[in-house]
Amino acid sequence: MASQDKYYLFLDECGDQNLSSFDPNFPIFTLCGIIVSEQNLGILETQINDLKMRLWKNINIIFHSRDIRKCQNGFENFFDLSVKQDFYKSINEILGQDIYVVICCAILKEPYIRQYGKMNDVYGQSLSFIMERTVFYLDSLKNCNANLTTVIERRGKKEDNALLDYYNRVLDKGTYWVTSDRMKKYFKKFEMKWKKDNIVGLQIADLIAYPVTRYILNPEGVNYAFDVINKNIYQDRGKLYGLKVFPKET
């Protein structure tokens, strides 16, 4: 039996799934995935933990986009601008490396409600797009025999059961473009981790989700964080598969 290459898909979100009541200034839900090989994940983990040790003297700080922006929950040292600048320079160097791939799906709530109503499932829709495009990416790798583990952050028993149901539904039914058998060729394991578990891959997905969302809402705005990770968004033969915006505005 041929040996398998171990890959991970880490998923995090920006915005909420609520279609009944939402901030008109932030009418979007984004599910962001990063795909990384086991070898490259080890590189990223070492670099992130080295940065944590240098600025916090321990590796237990959890990189969370909102806390970083608000300088709270362990990031109060960012009120010292020299520390903040040091962090952003270092994290941009880490995330700017071409050793992982970004695949995101953003749901624009207002046109989505107009077309599909408020009862439809934005998380399941987003996950199906990401899983589909993950298959496209792994198919594109030469001589790849990938064994993929999907990792999602735990929310609570009810929410966790819903996440697992979404995953199994896509795996069992496939999508319009990808059959169930083709999906199951790669998707082998599904894991849920608490934020306190300090999973570097989930933290990277979190750091990427916000700038991607800001870019979709305002593509002409200044967005240095997006500029850093833009080249890592999955493309194939000139087609941008890794940034799905749904539905398309008409």
Model-assigned labels for residue ranges:
Residues 1-250:
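Phosphate-ester processing/binding pockets and catalytic centers
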